[in-house]
Amino acid sequence: MLVSKKSDLLLLIIVVFLFFSGNTLQANEKPQETMDRILEFSIKILEKSLQSENAFIRSAAARAAGESEYSGLIPLLKKAAKDSYHTTRLFALQGIKKISLNEARTLSIDMSKDLNVWVRGAAIEMLGELGDGTSGSIIQSHLKSPDRTVRYAAAGALFKLGDESQLDILLDGLKGGSSIDRYQAIGYLGKLNDKKLTPYLEDLLSGNEDEVIFYSLKAIGKKADQDMLPRLLNLMKHVNPSLRYQSALTLGELKGDSGLDALRSLCSDENAMVRLSAAVALVRKKSDYCHEIFSVMIKDADYGIRSSTARMLGELEIQNREQLLLMALMDKNIRVRTSATRAVGMMGGPRAFPLLLSKLEDSQEVVRTYAAGNIIKLMKQ
């Protein structure tokens, strides 16, 4: 088992674990043995959660096991892939990809026959990412599926394998059908990560359906370029706060100082999510402006805002991130604590250990589950 070479880190982990778990060292127990006990303790938490009668907890166990990136949890993920609840199966499939591409490829072939349309679509999509020449025939068999989601997934998967002949299935999906169907086509097109397809998404920004514009902005994401700047600046003035905050996040992906003044102006927007998104975008642009917003948002009266703030802090390197996440870990709301726990895992580093270890005895099983998965991840780094 891999551990840090720094003796102070080992001692920190041991002391904190003993403090929170109530365990005691054996008379001649070595630090490595204690580390192994922490690993075993965390694995048991995940195993227990996967046996829960609560489907939400089982799903958390599958997702947390994937976040651990630990090969020793592949058997647990394979078991989760056969769960009766479709979200648990979906998280198991997504999680195993983070650990073993070969296992993920094998599992995606099997789950391409799943009864749930979302799981089936995700498995087909994964075959496009991980498959080889033999995967094409499996994917093509789903092009005539009665489920639009599956057809979209198949067309996208073939595109990733170099076959662009079915791209019209996705492009046609942008034009008609129900709004939900259009959102799906937009999402799959965005996940192809091909800049030559971005103009199709950009064209949707000129429409009059707020939801279509919102999902198009999300799909464009990091593929945004300077040519989009005028549209983004215009959308940042939109009456719909969802469009203001999503256009701000997209603007944050542009390189350089473009749009800084517009982002700074949104730091005083009437909507909390817009203010938060502007602050996130400014951090991504290496600007120190509006950093105080994170300290305000982590204490907002709306638990949804507190949760979103905690989640975003996992991706951002700001000076007081650890202190803000500590506040979120002690929040009375389970959703906020869950987001904070996962964010601490994303933050990583020696200082993440005591924060995560403290959550192994949280009052809610879902928080303990995510803490266990992320502790395992940190121990393997």
Residue ranges and their predicted role:
Residues 12-21:
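Bacterial N-terminal signal peptides
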Residues 147-225, 240-245:
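Solenoidal tandem-repeat scaffolds enriched in leucines and small polar residues
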